[in-house]
Design a protein with these regions (language model features):
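Rhodanese-like catalytic fold shared by cysteine-dependent sulfurtransferases
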Residues: 1, 6-33, 47-78, 84-125
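Active-site-proximal loop/helix segments of hydrolase catalytic cores
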Residues: 49, 242-308, 320
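Active-site HxH/HxHxD metal-binding segment of metal-dependent hydrolases
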Residues: 167-226, 234-239
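Active-site neighborhood of phospho(di)ester-bond hydrolases with catalytic His/Asp-centered motifs
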Residues: 83, 156-160, 176-187, 204-208, ...
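Zn-dependent metallo-beta-lactamase
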Residues: 11, 123-151, 330-333
Length: 342
């Protein structure tokens, strides 16, 4: 256990009890912790440092940010933290342990990790908790490609390995338990990647156009599907409304999806504009809304859509070269997160 350090914030736990919840561990033990589905991995460095390379599956919460305490107040359970050398993460560990978490701190930080020959990644990760405390990790791959880890299961959305010079090495990921495909355009429907990710047990969900080209579970707008007791999938409309654009995504052909994981509701809108049917999309925790004309929405349309859906967290995606940096200031009541979904 660590030596006494000054507590970084107040809390119900005494400082001595909080310190007993912290353990500083080496690279090998930290790597083992990263394989556990109940451990939340946090990089407490700056966003710039995180973007340059981080441990796979880690989310970024800057311990030096003024809102750090706000960001961690609802985090429970077991947490593994790291920084550059281990000092900032120790400060973060104290605050997390004061909140009741059991915390493991990486001795020597990412420098020790790299010295040991361990790999890092630039794929951004956001972590959420379900109603029963299960962790959901959402990895921003590119464009409309989303990887979701939930309770030991792998979910891939519109997997595409190569797009305009950007690539995703799907061979580095586990096989998929569920694959969701919104429609049959090349930047969403990559049959080679789907085949590579699939096993005989993989549930492949597609719209009608894709199901005509590849074996899978066809879902039309309005269809619902339960997967076990804790996962449900609903196909919802996704289409163009602007005059001269309707041919890109005709009404009733393509899908968006509402994926519910143990009560956590995730809306992946697919290629769509701000359509009337969005008013029926309710109680959304996390929304992915597309932003690039002429194929999907303008930033103004995206803002309108967000005000209709009212998600707690919003990820603009599929935005290519569209400037989405001004969206957050127009949606002060929504946690807007810009990730590399160009």
């Amino acid at each position: 256990m660590i030596a006494a350090v000054a507590a970084g914030c107040g809390g119900a736990q005494s400082s001595d009890v909080a310190k007993d919840r912290i353990e500083t561990v080496g690279v090998e033990q930290f790597a083992e912790l990263m394989t556990r589905k109940d451990v939340r991995l946090i990089d407490v460095r700056t966003p710039k440092e995180y973007a340059e390379g981080h441990l796979e599956g880690s989310e970024n919460i800057d311990v030096k940010a003024t809102d750090f305490a706000e960001h961690i107040k609802d985090i429970k359970g077991t947490v593994a933290v790291y920084c550059r050398s281990g000092k900032r993460s120790l400060t973060a560990a104290v605050q997390l342990s004061t909140n009741g978490c059991s915390v493991y701190n990486l001795d020597g930080g990412i420098l020790a990790w790299q010295k040991a020959g361990r790999k890092t990644t630039t794929i951004e990760t956001d972590i959420f908790s379900t109603r029963n405390g299960k962790l959901v990790k959402i990895h921003a791959l590119m464009h409309a490609c989303i990887r979701i880890e939930y309770d030991g299961r792998e979910i891939e959305v519109d997997p595409c390995a190569n797009l305009n010079g950007r690539t995703v090495d799907y061979s580095a990921f586990p096989k998929a338990d569920i694959i969701l495909v919104t429609h049959d355009h090349f930047d969403h429907f990559d049959t080679a990647t789907i085949n590579m990710l699939s096993t005989e047990k993989t549930l492949l969900v597609m719209n009608r156009a894709c199901a005509e080209k590849m074996d899978g579970k066809r879902m039309d707008n309005g269809d619902k599907l339960s997967v076990g007791t804790d996962i449900s999938i609903e196909a919802v409309p996704a289409y163009n409304t602007t005059k001269g654009h309707q041919q890109f995504h005709p009404k009733k052909r393509d899908n968006g999806y509402i994926l519910c994981l143990d009560g956590l509701r995730i809306y992946m809108a697919g290629d769509t504009e701000d359509i009337p049917e969005m008013s029926k999309v309710k109680n959304i925790d996390i929304a992915f809304l597309p932003c690039n004309q002429p194929y999907t929405m303008t930033p103004e349309q995206l803002v309108r859509a967000a005000k209709i859906v009212k998600p707690k967290v919003l990820f603009p995606y599929h935005y290519s070269e569209t400037d989405v940096t001004g969206i957050a200031e127009q949606l002060p009541d929504i946690d807007v997160r810009i990730r590399h979904y160009e």
